[in-house]
């Protein structure tokens, strides 16, 4: 890529990324590294890993920024980068929260019954 393709994203507070492919590759790889620490049978890992691998393959296969934006369907690449940063943050939290483990205590019998 020969320099920045655009001067602004047109979105307040969202700066243009000069190396979006590199940034996305790094973020998606970090997400996959965190997911590897979560049990394979956890639903969050299974589905997030599948989506992240698909997106990483698109980033590696498509050098054209505009075509990649169209394939990822997440807006401008700067927006996709922001989404990937949020997913990485969530993956780290999920790893720490361990939602796949059993509850500490049993929930009340009518917890989800409505109306009571």
Swiss-Prot record:
Query: Where is the PTM Phosphoserine found along the chain?
Result: 89
Listed A to Z, the keywords are:
Acetylation, Electron transport, Membrane, Mitochondrion, Mitochondrion inner membrane, Phosphoprotein, Respiratory chain, Transport
One term under GO cellular component = mitochondrial inner membrane
The organism is: Macaca fascicularis
Query: Mind telling me which InterPro entries this protein's record contains?
Result: NDUFA5
Residues folding into a coiled coil are none
Q: Which residues carry this modification: N-acetylalanine?
A: 2
Superkingdom, according to UniProt? Answer: Eukaryota
Subunit (UniProt): Complex I is composed of 45 different subunits.
Q: What's the protein called, per UniProt?
A: NADH dehydrogenase [ubiquinone] 1 alpha subcomplex subunit 5
Could you tell me the Gene Ontology terms of the biological process aspect for this record? respiratory electron transport chain
Primary location group: mitochondrion
Q: What does this protein do?
A: Accessory subunit of the mitochondrial membrane respiratory chain NADH dehydrogenase (Complex I), that is believed not to be involved in catalysis. Complex I functions in the transfer of electrons from NADH to the respiratory chain. The immediate electron acceptor for the enzyme is believed to be ubiquinone.
Concerning PANTHER family, the annotation shows: NADH DEHYDROGENASE [UBIQUINONE] 1 ALPHA SUBCOMPLEX SUBUNIT 5, NADH-UBIQUINONE OXIDOREDUCTASE 13 KD-B SUBUNIT
Q: List the disulfide bonds.
A: none
Where in this protein does the record say N6-acetyllysine is found? 30, 46, 60, 98
Q: Which family does it belong to?
A: Belongs to the complex I NDUFA5 subunit family.
Stored Pfam families = ETC_C1_NDUFA5
Give the location in the cell: Mitochondrion inner membrane
Positions carrying N6-succinyllysine are 98
**Lipid bilayer topology:** Peripheral membrane protein
């Amino acid at each position: 890529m020969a320099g920045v393709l655009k001067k602004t994203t047109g979105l307040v507070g969202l700066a243009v990324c000069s190396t979006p492919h590199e940034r996305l590759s790094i973020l998606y790889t970090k997400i996959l590294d965190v997911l590897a620490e979560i049990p394979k049978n956890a639903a969050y890992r299974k589905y997030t890993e599948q989506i992240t691998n698909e997106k990483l393959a698109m980033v590696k296969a498509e050098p054209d920024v505009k075509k990649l934006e169209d394939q990822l369907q997440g807006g401008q690449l700067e927006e996709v980068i922001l989404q990937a940063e949020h997913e990485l943050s969530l993956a780290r939290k999920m790893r720490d929260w361990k939602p796949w483990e059993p509850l500490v205590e049993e929930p009340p019998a009518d917890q989800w019954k409505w109306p009571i």
